[in-house]
Amino acid sequence: QVIEPWLCTRATPFTDALCREAIPRGIAALKTLMEKECADSRDELAWVSLCGGLALANAGLGVVHGLAGPLGGLSDASHGALCGCLLPFGLELNESQVTNPALRQRFLDVRQWIAAGLGVSPDDAWQSLREWSQRSGLGNLRDLGVPREALEPAALAASSSSSMKANPVTLESEQLLEMLEAAWE
């Protein structure tokens, strides 16, 4: 919930200040917690969560949350698992549609933060995030119990959801469906 506000159309200096530090700290803390229990990392994630709540309330969200809402209503999958599963796919889809140089830089920032946290090249950030998530036990949409027949209604519902209003690029329901199908496989 700190990555989407960084990329949203309604990002402000206030939300940027919250997200700029929270994103890399959140990645590092989550990576540690997936390997071992660590009270300091739990404290970090609590701080990141606070920053995320403040940032999303002020900047909005995007495609990941736009799709997670309808999918949660059409399945028993948890909101957090849906967002975690969808994040690398949403980053990839959004970035592929960006033409604005300033927004391209924001995506590069996220690539660099993820790459640093996972110890990979920024060019490999989205794929590495997807692979790390799966190695850490977060499966694809199918593994989360999302029925394939829920994908199209979710894409249609998301295309007009309030969470999509601040997405950095306009996405059609067909693009959302393609993204969901990739995340389901």
Model-flagged regions — what are they?
Residues 5-10, 33, 52, 74, ...:
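Alpha-helix C-capping/helix-to-loop hinge sites
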Residues 50-83, 161-166:
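Glycine-rich phosphate/pyrophosphate-binding beta-alpha loops
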Residues 38-42, 76-78, 174:
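Structural motif
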Residues 1-4, 20-31, 46, 50, ...:
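Predominant activation on well-ordered alpha-helical scaffold segments within soluble catalytic domains
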Residues 148-185:
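Short, amphipathic C-terminal "tail helix"
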Residues 74-150:
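Gly/Pro-rich interdomain helix-loop hinge
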Residues 1-59, 168:
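Carboxylate- and glycine-rich phosphate/diphosphate-binding segment that chelates Mg2+/Mn2+
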